[in-house]
A protein has these predicted regions:
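Short amphipathic alpha-helical interaction elements located at domain edges
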Residues: 1-104
Length: 104
C-alpha cells in the first residue's frame, strides 16, 4: 500500500495526489457533475494555448492550496479550459488506476 502511495505522489505532487486518491474511490471533489458530463459529451480536441496556460495555473493552485481555493480556481476557468482540466484529471486517474496493484 505504501508503494502505491509513493507512485501516486510521484504522478501527482502536493495536494493533487490526495484528490486523485479520492477520485480512485469515485469521489471527484474538484468538479460538479455537470462539468464532468460536459467534458465527456464534447468531442476530444487538442488544448488551445490560452487554455493550457489557464489549466497550468489551476494545477499549481490544486497542488498547493486547500480544496475550497482549488474549487474556486476551477470554477473561475473559462469553459473550454475547465473542460480540458476535467479531461486531464480523468487521464491522470486512468494512469493512477494502472499503477494500483490488482485486488482479488
Amino acid at each position: 500500500m505504501e508503494r502505491h502511495r509513493e507512485k501516486l505522489v510521484a504522478l501527482a505532487p502536493g495536494r493533487l495526489s490526495g484528490i486523485l486518491a479520492q477520485g480512485l474511490r469515485g469521489h471527484h471533489p474538484l468538479f460538479d457533475k455537470a462539468a464532468i458530463r460536459a467534458a465527456f459529451d464534447a468531442p476530444d480536441a487538442p488544448m488551445a494555448r490560452e487554455d493550457a496556460n489557464a489549466v497550468g495555473r489551476a494545477l499549481l493552485t490544486i497542488c498547493k492550496e486547500p480544496l475550497d481555493v482549488a474549487r474556486a480556481e476551477v470554477a473561475a476557468l473559462p469553459g473550454s479550459a475547465r473542460l480540458s482540466l476535467v479531461r486531464l484529471y480523468f487521464r491522470l486517474l486512468d494512469r493512477a488506476q494502472e499503477e494500483q496493484p490488482l485486488r482479488h
